[in-house]
C-alpha cells in the first residue's frame, strides 16, 4: 500500500511482532522517537472512534520550573512548566494534569505571585492540544523546581506532547539545576 500510493512523511509504516523480546527491545528506542507500543488482537482492524487497542507509553521522570499556574496561588490546579533555553530564556515545555488536593496544598506554600518583568508576561497559553481557547493563568516567580512524570514524546520545539504528572516539589534544586531545553521554540 505504501509503495502503490507513494506515501511518505508524515506517514510511517509501523512494524509489528508477537515476540515479547522484540517489544522489550523497541521500548529501549525512546531516544530515536519510539513513544511506546500498541497492543491489539491479531485479527483486529482499525475502527475510527472505537477504543479497542491499548497503548503502553514510555515514561520518564524529569525536572522543570513552575512559571505559571491555573487556579490560585493558594490553591493551584495545574502547573505550567518551563526550562531555560541556550540563551537563558525561560521557555514553556508543558503543563501538568490536574493536581490532587494534597499536591496543590503542598505546592501552594512554595509559590510566589509573579513580579513585573516575569519572562512569560504577555504570553498566552492554549487550554489544550490544538485548542483555540486561551487558558486563564496566574504567573508565579520561576523559582520552584518540580519533578514530573512525562511521556518521552516531544514536539518539534522540544515541548512535552502530553500532560506531565506531578511527582513532587524539589526545593533541594534551583532552576539552574534543571536540564536546558535542547530544541528551543522558534
List each model region and its residues.
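Catalytic cores of nucleic-acid ligases and guanylyltransferases
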Residues: 1-186
Amino acid at each position: 500500500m505504501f509503495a502503490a500510493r507513494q506515501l511518505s512523511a508524515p506517514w510511517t509504516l509501523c512494524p509489528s511482532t508477537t515476540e515479547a523480546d522484540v517489544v522489550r527491545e523497541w521500548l529501549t528506542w525512546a531516544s530515536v522517537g519510539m513513544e511506546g507500543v500498541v497492543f491489539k488482537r491479531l485479527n483486529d482492524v482499525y475502527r475510527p472512534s472505537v477504543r479497542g487497542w491499548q497503548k503502553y507509553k514510555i515514561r520518564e521522570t524529569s525536572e522543570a520550573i513552575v512559571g505559571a499556574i491555573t487556579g490560585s496561588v493558594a490553591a493551584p490546579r495545574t502547573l505550567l512548566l518551563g526550562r531555560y533555553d541556550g540563551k537563558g530564556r525561560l521557555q514553556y515545555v508543558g503543563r501538568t494534569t490536574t493536581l490532587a488536593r494534597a499536591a496543590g496544598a503542598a505546592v501552594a506554600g512554595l509559590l510566589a505571585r509573579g513580579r513585573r518583568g516575569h519572562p512569560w508576561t504577555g504570553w498566552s497559553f492554549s487550554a489544550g492540544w490544538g485548542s483555540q481557547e486561551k487558558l486563564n493563568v496566574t504567573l508565579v516567580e520561576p523559582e520552584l523546581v518540580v519533578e514530573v512524570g512525562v511521556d518521552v514524546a516531544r514536539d518539534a520545539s522540544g515541548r512535552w506532547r502530553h500532560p506531565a504528572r506531578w511527582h513532587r516539589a524539589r526545593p533541594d534544586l534551583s532552576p539552574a539545576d534543571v536540564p536546558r531545553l535542547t530544541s528551543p521554540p522558534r
